Each structure stands twice: as structure tokens, then as C-alpha cells.
């Protein structure tokens, strides 16, 4: 009887481990505390270099904590979007450096970089991130000013007579 109980307990433990793995959908070999995943993200004139590693959810941008670098809460929420979609909100630490552009462009570059790094860390996230539109680069840039006009599209006032 005791051997049967031990076997059933082992089977139950194994089943619970397997069910947890299926819920997380992260392959076993990818949960590695040593490995780092690198990706670059771009938006407008901003370029972000992102390093992702298994951790406690700490995000550092240009040697500042995320809330210090982006004071607006909406920016922070959009940067956390890939983690919310993949349900890995406190499982990865992010270190990134951003150059160029303004605050909005830098936010988009970091978002794109984090999404690409998450895709590299666990390929099972690819479909989720692709469906959320986080892996595609937003190619919209400022239209150039044309000569003979006031702005890119604004013309001088036209007079018939």
C-alpha cells in the first residue's frame, strides 16, 4: 500500500508540473537564468537596444527605473504590453538603452525591442505577439518639408485675382 501511495504521489506531482508548464507555455530549456536575449527596436528616429533575462520584473532604461524615465503612466502601460499579453509580467528583467527621437518614439522603440527579445526567449510567444501587432515595426516617419510650401503639406494661400 505504501508503494502505491508513493507512486500515485509521484504521478500527481508530475501531472501538476506538466500542467504548470502548459499554462506558462515556456519550453523547459528556455527557462535559463544565465542566458540573456538581445534585440533592437526602432520607431521614428529612436533606436532601442534591449537585453532580456529571467528575473523579477525590473525594467531599467538608460540607467534609470522605468517610472523615472517615463513619468506618464500611459507610457509605462504600453511598454508593459508584451509582458501582459504573454502573462510574464514579473518573470523577466529588462535593461535597455535608447538613443534619438522624442519620448513617444523612444517608447515605441522600447516596446518593439522588448517584443522581439521575448520572441527570441520563447518561440511559443511568436503567435501571441504577432497577433497583438507588437513584432511589426511601425514605419511611419515625419514627412519632409517641400520647397515652395510652408510645411510638408501646407501650401501658401492661393489667390485667383
Swiss-Prot record:
- Keyword Ribonucleoprotein among UniProt keywords: yes
UniProt cross-references to SUPFAM superfamilies, sorted A to Z = Ribosomal protein S5 domain 2-like
**Classification via PROSITE patterns:** RIBOSOMAL_S9
Keywords of the record: Ribonucleoprotein, Ribosomal protein
**Sorted alphabetically, which InterPro entries does this protein's record hold?**
Ribosomal_Su5_D2-typ_SF, Ribosomal_uS9, Ribosomal_uS9_bac/plastid, Ribosomal_uS9_CS, Ribsml_uS5_D2-typ_fold_subgr
State the superkingdom: Bacteria
Q: What Gene Ontology biological process does one annotation of this record name?
A: translation
A Gene Ontology CC term for this entry? cytosolic small ribosomal subunit
- Note whether Ribosomal protein occurs among the keywords: yes
Q: Which GO terms describe its molecular function?
A: RNA binding; structural constituent of ribosome
Against Pfam families, the record matches this protein to:
Ribosomal_S9
Give the family per the record: Belongs to the universal ribosomal protein uS9 family.
Q: What is this protein called?
A: Small ribosomal subunit protein uS9
Source organism? Rickettsia prowazekii (strain Madrid E)
Its taxonomic placement starts with: Bacteria, Pseudomonadati, Pseudomonadota, Alphaproteobacteria, Rickettsiales
Amino acid at each position: 500500500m505504501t508503494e502505491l501511495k508513493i507512486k500515485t504521489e509521484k504521478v500527481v506531482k508530475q501531472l501538476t508540473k506538466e500542467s504548470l508548464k502548459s499554462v506558462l507555455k515556456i519550453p523547459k530549456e528556455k527557462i535559463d537564468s544565465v542566458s540573456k536575449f538581445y534585440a533592437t527596436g526602432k520607431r521614428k528616429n529612436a533606436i532601442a537596444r534591449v537585453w532580456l533575462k529571467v528575473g523579477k520584473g525590473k525594467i531599467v532604461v538608460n540607467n534609470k527605473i522605468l517610472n523615472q524615465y517615463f513619468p506618464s503612466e500611459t507610457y509605462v502601460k504600453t511598454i508593459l504590453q508584451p509582458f501582459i499579453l504573454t502573462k510574464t509580467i514579473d518573470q523577466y528583467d529588462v535593461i535597455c538603452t535608447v538613443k534619438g527621437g522624442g519620448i513617444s518614439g523612444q517608447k515605441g522603440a522600447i516596446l518593439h525591442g522588448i517584443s522581439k527579445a521575448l520572441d527570441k526567449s520563447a518561440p511559443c510567444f511568436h503567435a501571441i505577439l504577432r497577433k497583438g501587432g507588437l513584432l511589426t515595426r511601425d514605419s511611419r516617419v515625419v514627412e519632409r518639408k517641400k520647397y515652395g510650401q510652408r510645411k510638408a503639406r501646407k501650401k501658401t494661400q492661393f489667390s485667383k485675382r
